[in-house]
Amino acid sequence: MNNGRFYKRYPPQHALDNWIGTAELIGRGGWTNFKHLFFHPDGTLYGVWGNKFYKAPPPTSASQSWIDEATLVGAAGWQVFQLLFFDPHGVLYGVTDGKLYRRSPPTHSLDDWIGSATLVGTGGWHVFKFLFFDPQGFLYGVENGKFHKRSPPCHANDNWLGSSTLVGTAGWSSFQQLFFMGDGQLYGVVNGNFYKRSPPAYSMDNWLGSAKLIGVGGWSGFKFLMAPVAHG
């Protein structure tokens, strides 16, 4: 997503691969107005616009009005979420007021998601810049420049951060984008460049120094970069 427009293509393969020049335009404008835009593992696109939550298949042409065709699955209150994301089985996780919740995604506009969701983190979750899952169901998080990994918390008092594996000691807050794709590779944008590699396995693993450069310059212009991640 760049300059309010929405594009799709398979990921770049090398540093000089002109991704945006060869990508298909599937949305002409307004897409940067979404606070959250992300995929369910089945390929359904979910988005928060204002205080409302929508879902629909992704657009297939630039002339399509996605939001007019989408199903409203949340009528109000969704602007409070700092982070919203799916695990690879399609369970929705959300962070608000420092707390972490999980539940199946809402199915209609009056579905009281947060009122019936399971609280799996009582506080402190606001410190994370990124939270996301890999295809195997491990939860990754970036806070204070550090990169953590662990199975997701299963109850409200589960000390996830304190018992997670540290897989990066510094510098991870500099990334503008950080996410997995279905191939199990970790993709990241930092200083306008786009990289990919297997995820770091230990704290001193020099991910950026050994990652493959797949995009030179301009990648910081994207508000969202995303793909569906189903269970591997």
Briefly describe each language-model feature range.
Residues M1-G232:
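Trp/Gly-enriched beta-strand/coil motifs that build multi-repeat beta-propeller-like domains
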